[in-house]
């Protein structure tokens, strides 16, 4: 079984302590993708798909509700981002949402990807790097999605 390395708390939910304790002692495989691939994946999964979910629930208020959802999510990490980074990313996010509202999808997508890239480089990547340095002794494999899938397909569960 492969699981994403998570903290015990995930939003308002939490992983059972015994399960999380076992996860924290288990070997790790690192999925390594380019920055652009990660930006594209996050855009598709968290922006495009989430917006479609908002539209399917209530089309007339989807833009406003989705905008509030994104801006509130960013606000929750404002203190950790720092004032300047927060304001810069928030400004780009608001521009992206406005372009989407005006049906300028190409510009909206480019702006969303711009703030996603800044958030990855300025916040998430340094945080993950710090966490992975603490867990480096447990890492048994690193590779791209294709490499990782190939490696995993040849594993003998008794060896891991």
Tell me what each language-model feature is.
Residues 1-16:
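Conserved nucleotide-sensing/catalytic segment adjacent to the nucleotide-binding pocket
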Residues 21-160:
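Conserved NTP phosphate-binding and transfer environment spanning the P-loop NTPase/kinase superfamily
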